[in-house]
């Protein structure tokens, strides 16, 4: 019987490039003719995605699935932790809400979850040639070792060899790699088969003596040095280079809510060459944007009250008299008349006044809506997904923005979102609403016409993503020892 080949990418800390390296390896293995699956046992992020069957998962594994040529599925990220407040999070297990917990409560659940993960992983072994596993944070969090289910604990559970990645761009990469190895147990050190230096800028010849000294100290080889290069690929943590086109003529501003979620809603906008995207964090940042986006939130009521307290709500209301506003999910709810929370899902407040810019009321329910949708308006097709606890009820005279005709592949007929009578303030529950060409093109061309600019065709975001995935794979393949990697995974 064929044995599944496994490789795990761990890192010296957060944001060292684990996700992007896993993405690259998934595309490389796919290019080489293997069936490959990405996997991360536990992810913590506010950004999430809804699968074709209505399950919720982390965005990083979605991009990795695309790199592998797969439809994203929740088993690729069985545990998703979504922070809801200080020391608290919502646990998503196998794509469905498991419950809310404090950090300590979740820590005490890990043994039980570990057993579930081990059983579930057996199903992956039967479907693929290779699985590329991503760790979280650092394996050297020695206070978490006894119940670890995402780094060395998981590598041991499934008997996966490990490559340890370090970020040279932030400085101290040799100390980070050597220090991490020092804090591992002997068994864990034996599992590490190589290191990867990520985000390198400069002359490799200057780096080589350091690599030799590092190998002498930790007794494992450097598998590759990957250059620093930015790709137009989504970032699950929202670390978006919004100012990439800082001098572009179209100014799009996003309200940076304290509990902002689903940063990836703006990724498709940032690839347009004449668009600049920036965050607004205070009244002083507001300026005169061509489009204002009020994004999703993990706690809509608390974020609305924060906007009210800092004066941004009044700026938004003032801007609505002349500017264009789009609210997405929680942002849509904020633009409505009232937000009612009878079950105290988000707040102790039973009712909170909204901004009053859209003629809808929101009622927060106990059950979360998670669904993939296709929708249209008079002349525009959109697609995306919904993740929300609230339901919006239309008041007299309210006008829906879209008609949803498909939910998770089933025919439906229901309204989504709202648009005001003037047509300049609108809201929708659909995340990813800008990913499709038609709505993005319509919104941007309306702005271009108002600024006497030439209209343009929108860039096909999915095609651009595929091109960038291939470019990423080429870069990583050129700069790491793939023969060595195939050797350690037994291929």
Curated annotation (Swiss-Prot):
The keyword Cell membrane does not apply. Keywords: Cobalamin biosynthesis, Glutamine amidotransferase. Gene3D superfamilies: 3.40.50.880, P-loop containing nucleotide triphosphate hydrolases (3.40.50.300). The active site is at residues 329, 431. Residues 249-439 form the GATase cobBQ-type domain. GO terms for molecular function: ABC-type vitamin B12 transporter activity; catalytic activity. Belongs to the CobB/CobQ family. CobQ subfamily. This is Cobyric acid synthase. The lineage of its organism: Bacteria, Bacillati, Bacillota, Clostridia, Eubacteriales.
């Amino acid at each position: 019987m064929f044995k599944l080949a496994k490789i795990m990418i761990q890192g010296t800390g957060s944001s060292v490039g684990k996700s992007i390296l896993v993405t690259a390896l998934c595309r490389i293995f796919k290019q080489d003719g293997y069936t490959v699956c990405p996997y991360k046992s536990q992810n913590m992020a506010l950004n999430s995605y809804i699968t074709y069957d209505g399950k919720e998962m982390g965005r990083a594994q979605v991009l990795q699935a695309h790199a592998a040529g797969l439809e994203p599925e929740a088993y690729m990220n069985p545990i998703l932790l979504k922070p809801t407040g200080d020391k608290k999070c919502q646990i998503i297990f196998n794509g469905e809400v498991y419950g809310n917990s404090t950090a300590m409560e979740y820590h005490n659940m890990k043994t039980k979850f570990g057993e579930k993960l081990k059983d579930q992983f057996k199903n992956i072994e039967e479907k693929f040639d290779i699985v590329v596993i991503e760790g979280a944070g650092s394996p050297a969090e020695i206070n978490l070792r006894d119940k670890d289910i995402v780094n060395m604990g998981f590598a041991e559970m499934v008997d996966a060899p490990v490559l340890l990645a370090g970020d040279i761009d932030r400085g101290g990469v040799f100390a980070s790699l050597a220090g991490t190895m020092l804090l591992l147990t002997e068994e864990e050190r034996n599992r590490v088969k190589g290191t990867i230096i990520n985000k390198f800028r400069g002359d490799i010849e200057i780096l080589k003596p350091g690599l030799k000294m590092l190998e002498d100290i930790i007794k494992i080889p450097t598998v590759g040095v990957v250059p620093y290069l930015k790709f137009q690929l989504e970032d699950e943590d929202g670390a978006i280079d919004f100012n990439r086109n800082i001098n572009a003529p179209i100014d799009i501003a996003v309200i940076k809510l304290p509990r902002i979620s689903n940063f990836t809603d703006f990724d498709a906008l940032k690839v347009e060459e004449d668009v600049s995207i920036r965050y607004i964090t205070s009244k002083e940042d507001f300026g005169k944007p061509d489009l204002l986006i009020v994004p999703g939130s993990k706690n809509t009521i608390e974020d609305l009250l924060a906007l009210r307290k800092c004066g941004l709500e009044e700026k938004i209301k003032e801007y609505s008299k002349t500017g264009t506003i789009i609210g997405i999910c929680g942002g849509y709810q904020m633009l409505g008349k009232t937000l009612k929370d009878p079950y105290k899902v988000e707040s102790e407040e039973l009712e909170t006044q909204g901004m009053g810019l859209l003629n809808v009321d929101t009622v927060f329910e106990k059950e979360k809506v998670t669904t993939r949708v296709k929708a249209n308006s008079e002349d525009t097709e959109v697609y995306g997904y919904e993740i929300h606890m609230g339901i919006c009820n239309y008041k007299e005279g309210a006008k829906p923005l879209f008609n949803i005709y498909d939910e998770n592949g089933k025919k439906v007929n229901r309204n989504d979102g709202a648009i005001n009578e003037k047509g300049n303030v609108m809201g929708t529950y659909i995340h990813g609403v800008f990913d499709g060409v038609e709505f993005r093109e319509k919104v941007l061309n309306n702005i271009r016409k108002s600024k006497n600019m030439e209209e343009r065709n929108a860039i096909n975001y999915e095609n651009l993503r595929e091109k960038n995935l291939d470019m990423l794979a080429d870069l990583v393949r050129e700069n790491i020892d793939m023969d060595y990697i195939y050797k350690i995974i037994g291929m």
